[in-house]
């Protein structure tokens, strides 16, 4: 695990921990590294899990799919991001999401039950870890609340403007990249891609934004 320490150090989950403490925790919870090719499923809806995933490299999409193949993207996970933690922390919980590799990826699987069970000596770094996990879960709730704000808008135009405005504020710039391609953005906002493309074209003609692929430049005029 030594080679992944640069990634682990930058992860909010390990905030305030030394390299030795991080390695000790990984050993304590029997952390396991897996690799998955693009398009493969890490978690499938209908299953249950005792582990959560930490992205070491590559990216995954957290999605919901119906029987007819309609896809709703809940979030995208890149290096240093987590997925599956609410389900792993709830014994017997059935996944209503799937996690699929957007590209070849390496993932660290962590047993949440062991993470939530303090060591016999109640080691200080384990207590820090539990506090960090609570913070990670709280941040995930905020992200989902933000998505609800976007998709609760009545029109495709309003959903786009809500999302792009939030991204601009989050990145503190009127010029920014988003983590989605056009189809993924449509799936994330729960709109039809064709209708979204029409609205983006209108917004450009109105001078409210300029976009190319996943790059956007907003105008406040």
Give the ranges of each region predicted by the language model.
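Short phosphate-coordinating micro-motif centered on Lys-Gly-acidic
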Residues: 41-47
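Cyclic nucleotide-binding regulatory module and flanking cytosolic helices
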Residues: 1-38, 87-90
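Short, small/polar residue-rich loop motifs at catalytic or cofactor-binding pockets
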Residues: 28-29, 47-49
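A small-molecule sensor/coupling module
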Residues: 22, 95, 113-155
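Cyclic-nucleotide recognition modules
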Residues: 73-131
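Phosphate-/nucleic-acid-contacting segments
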Residues: 154-221
């Amino acid at each position: 695990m030594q080679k992944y320490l640069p990634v682990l150090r930058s992860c909010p989950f390990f905030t305030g921990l030394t390299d030795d403490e991080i390695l000790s925790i990984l050993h304590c919870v029997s952390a396991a590294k897996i690799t998955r090719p693009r398009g493969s499923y890490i978690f499938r809806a209908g299953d249950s899990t005792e582990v959560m995933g930490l992205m070491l490299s590559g990216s995954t999409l957290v999605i919901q799919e119906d029987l007819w193949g309609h896809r709703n993207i809940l979030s995208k996970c890149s290096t240093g991001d987590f997925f599956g933690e609410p389900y792993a922390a709830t014994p017997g919980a059935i996944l209503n999401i799937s996690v699929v590799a957007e590209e070849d990826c390496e993932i660290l699987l962590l047993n949440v039950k062991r993470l939530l069970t303090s060591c016999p000596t109640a080691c200080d770094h384990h207590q820090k870890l539990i506090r960090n996990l609570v913070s990670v879960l709280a941040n995930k709730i905020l992200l989902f609340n933000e998505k609800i704000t976007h998709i609760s808008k009545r029109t495709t135009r309003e959903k786009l403007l809500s999302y792009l405005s939030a991204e601009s504020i989050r990145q503190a710039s009127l010029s920014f990249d988003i983590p989605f391609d056009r189809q993924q953005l449509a799936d994330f906002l729960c709109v039809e891609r064709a209708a979204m493309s029409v609205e983006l074209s209108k917004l450009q003609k109105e001078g409210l934004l300029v976009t190319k692929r996943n790059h956007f430049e907003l105008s406040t005029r």
